[in-house]
From Swiss-Prot:
Cellular compartments per GO CC: host cell mitochondrion; host cell nucleus; virion component
Compartments, record wording: Virion; Host nucleus; Host mitochondrion
GO MF term set: RNA binding; RNA-directed RNA polymerase activity
Name of the protein in question: Polymerase basic protein 2
Keywords in alphabetical order: Cap snatching, Eukaryotic host gene expression shutoff by virus, Eukaryotic host transcription shutoff by virus, Host gene expression shutoff by virus, Host mitochondrion, Host nucleus, Host-virus interaction, Inhibition of host innate immune response by virus, Inhibition of host MAVS by virus, Inhibition of host RLR pathway by virus, Inhibition of host RNA polymerase II by virus, mRNA capping, mRNA processing, Viral immunoevasion, Viral transcription, Virion
Gene Ontology biological process terms in this record: 7-methylguanosine mRNA capping; cap snatching; DNA-templated transcription; symbiont-mediated suppression of host cytoplasmic pattern recognition receptor signaling pathway via inhibition of MAVS activity; symbiont-mediated suppression of host gene expression; symbiont-mediated suppression of host mRNA transcription via inhibition of RNA polymerase II activity; viral RNA genome replication
Subunit structure: Influenza RNA polymerase is composed of three subunits: PB1, PB2 and PA. Interacts (via N-terminus) with PB1 (via C-terminus). Interacts with nucleoprotein NP (via N-terminus). Interacts (via N-terminus) with host MAVS (via N-terminus); this interaction inhibits host innate immune response.
Protein family (similarity comment): Belongs to the influenza viruses PB2 family.
Organism: Influenza A virus (strain A/Northern Territory/60/1968 H3N2) (Influenza A virus (strain NT60))
Amino acid sequence: MERIKELRNLMSQSRTREILTKTTVDHMAIIKKYTSGRQEKNPSLRMKWMMAMKYPITADKRITEMVPERNEQGQTLWSKMSDAGSDRVMVSPLAVTWWNRNGPMTSTVHYPKVYKTYFEKVERLKHGTFGPVHFRNQVKIRRRVDINPGHADLSAKEAQDVIMEVVFPNEVGARILTSESQLTITKEKKEELQDCKISPLMVAYMLERELVRKTRFLPVAGGTSSVYIEVLHLTQGTCWEQMYTPGGEVRNDDVDQSLIIAARNIVRRAAVSADPLASLLEMCHSTQIGGTRMVDILRQNPTEEQAVDICKAAMGLRISSSFSFGGFTFKRTSGSSIKREEELLTGNLQTLKIRVHDGYEEFTMVGKRATAILRKATRRLVQLIVSGRDEQSVAEAIIVAMVFSQEDCMIKAVRGDLNFVNRANQRLNPMHQLLRHFQKDAKVLFQNWGIEHIDNVMGMIGVLPDMTPSTEMSMRGIRVSKMGVDEYSSTERVVVSIDRFLRVRDQRGNVLLSPEEVSETQGTEKLTITYSSSMMWEINGPESVLVNTYQWIIRNWETVKIQWSQNPTMLYNKMEFEPFQSLVPKAIRGQYSGFVRTLFQQMRDVLGTFDTTQIIKLLPFAAAPPKQSRMQFSSLTVNVRGSGMRILVRGNSPAFNYNKTTKRLTILGKDAGTLIEDPDEGTSGVESAVLRGFLILGKEDRRYGPALSINELSNLAKGEKANVLIGQGDVVLVMKRKRDSSILTDSQTATKRIRMAIN
């Protein structure tokens, strides 16, 4: 107060005012502070001071020919004085106004293309909706977020090559554009930016924004996708938040979201197959997300999520060194431990073999809706500070930490037997057994934990076993905080190994991830996910299995056909027919298979009975282990649409309908593709059609006139002879039989005779 009075007193004297406004600053330290180095020390003051001058801007000398000396109001636009230390002229801000209004017009066609990210942002904001502002305490935690909506996912190096190729195509320097995305983008941008007059440097900057993911470590409460982050300053403050719905989606957010869904589906499916790792790799390599190969996305996309990281580990990519337990990401911040096996008894006297962490360690735990700091010693929780969105989220974090602590009172709180299994019906490991048990019901765990009196610490309160907050008492070692715990900020990636059962370990052998950690949450992907692998056909239910199986046969018909005739057993064992078996009633699978295999064998033996449509229709039924029986079927049942539907052995049905004229196959009304019938069917002139009712006499005999086509044969009278053109352009002499004999003997002798006649 005294100082202020003194200052006021000084300011009232005219001499003080004069000293402050008129005298020069000659103190060396001050001069040094403001003149050393190139860095501007007070940019906003400098700007204000410059703009108060008459000619604060410098411009190229050519400006004097392009801009008049005075504008319509008679104000001077540029000074005849040169800028000190350069050959530029001094210009008034009014010259900029004149230029904007009267300067030369250039084509604006490239602006929306170059400044695409800005134009799109304006559109999103225009169509976005801002809701009410709420005042409340914001629990923000720092997370690594994507700050640049609408980008591709190229690495900095890949983007640099693309930019050089697009903007400076004639510059020297080795540029290798390898990835598909690089080539597509380069081609697209070169076309878009033909004759572009915007400065190359600007184009390069803008391209970088479009191609590379930029991340920052920012305090966030709420949505973390890039379309929310771009308005972070509008949606959350220290004590307020504003509701906001983005006015558009961007591909990078959609890719992230769809990648997580695809990875979860693939890990869940692989976990139940005979060889999880091989299956997972097969699925990753054959899946596309929004038209891009999933493996390409995995190589470029930095999303950290359990399933995504398992897929990356399988591909030999580096991942974050943090580990996952109970849906929380744990990062050790200090301490160390060694691991040793111990056998512990549960409250139900069941023995659990557990890897105990021996030593003092501190961790941060970050989940979707709660975060915590955990300090633990050997089998003892020392302290847990939790913060979360709501009571439920806080409870989830507490359960995970209590199980992770491996404390005796937690193990003794188990009631009943632990026999949880994973999707493949294998028992879970002991730690996950405990976790599942208490996630189902944590009442006994919380009651047995013990409570303690607490000191009053700013920003922290206690929590009782029934999850009510308290300022006097709390569960032992556990406090709830208003402040969130920041996510682990480092982007460091480590080399990991993965075993056959998809357990991911770091180089010290610690398990970082396993399929048990993959969330069961189902979502709808924003981009189309195309799983080409037959293992994923089941994901959309029985109908999709039916359609996909037949589509696969049609797409691969050329190879299937050869295998069908030469190596049927190998064909029947193809994994693509596995999903189909779940549609066939279990009791009759074997009989169907035996029946179809016998039918096929007859087709192979009896030339001329080959029937493409029928083979395609019945092939999936032959994949089950066959039972020998004398049963014949006129229709086969498949379980789709909640009931049995019939597929007719001969003829069409809703489940399998082939239109001979359009050559289209429809399965349950869905198009399954075009069938290219074999030339050896119908009337196209190969052995099979020759055989029925004709006797082959030998090589061509000119006396019987020119060779007829197979269609013309039908006009022959019984006993009449003719030359006929068969399949491979060979001509043989045939005679129409005098009586209709068995097709079978005809066919067999015919093949032998054709061979003899041709040779």
